[in-house]
């Protein structure tokens, strides 16, 4: 094979492929897998962060009966929008107690550069979209923009669980950043935000360095 074609094939093989797409059925349900609340299929969270998230959400469930799942995925290819994927996963897993609609799904799609938070109708009064939006803008996205997925996810879950438990939440924004914070989808108890593209490009660049190094 000519060297030029070998080089082209190598480059193409290292690019993100449609095979990375994930279906609802392929996302491990943490409740069934190990009795927890976190499914990190994108591998962006540390073990210590997952442990702390599980602790916070277990405490929330014990005190209020509300349930929360934290999910990371490489992308949501094959679905109309990241929000559509999130809503379908929320319903597929049946997050929240039966008859109470008191579930929350916090989803991060790295490839789509999206943060999606879906809330059950039973929580809309205490956790309206406006409050969720505030948490995303002030606590989650600024940290994600700095490459801190652990910190952003923890900060978001801490705020969400505090609100759901009726605890006072300090309205202190995180450090300022260049994150795009315009809302692109806010409907039916769901809030979506974009993650700055430079962060994902940095992740892909790092992946390329690891593969090629």
Regions of interest found by a model, annotated:
Residues 202-212:
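Core hydrophobic alpha-helical membrane-spanning segments
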């Amino acid at each position: 094979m000519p060297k030029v074609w070998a080089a082209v094939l190598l480059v193409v093989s290292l690019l993100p492929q449609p095979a990375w797409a994930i279906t609802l059925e392929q996302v491990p349900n943490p409740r069934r897998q190990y009795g927890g609340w976190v499914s990190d299929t994108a591998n962006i969270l540390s073990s210590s962060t997952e442990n702390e998230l599980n602790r916070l959400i277990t405490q929330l469930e014990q005190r209020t009966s509300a349930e929360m799942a934290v999910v990371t995925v490489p992308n949501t290819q094959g679905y109309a929008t990241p929000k559509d994927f999130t809503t379908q996963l929320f319903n597929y897993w049946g997050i929240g107690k039966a008859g109470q609609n008191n579930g929350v799904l916090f989803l991060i799609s790295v490839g789509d550069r999206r943060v999606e938070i879906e809330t059950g109708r039973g929580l809309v009064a205490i956790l309206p979209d406006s409050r969720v939006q505030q948490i995303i803008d002030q606590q989650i996205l600024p940290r994600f923009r700095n490459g801190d997925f652990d910190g952003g996810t923890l900060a978001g879950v801490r705020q969400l669980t505090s609100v759901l438990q009726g605890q006072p939440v300090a309205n202190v924004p995180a450090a300022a950043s260049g994150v795009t914070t315009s809302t692109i989808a806010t409907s039916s108890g769901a809030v979506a935000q974009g993650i700055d593209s430079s962060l994902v490009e940095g992740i892909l660049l790092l992946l390329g360095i690891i593969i090629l190094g």
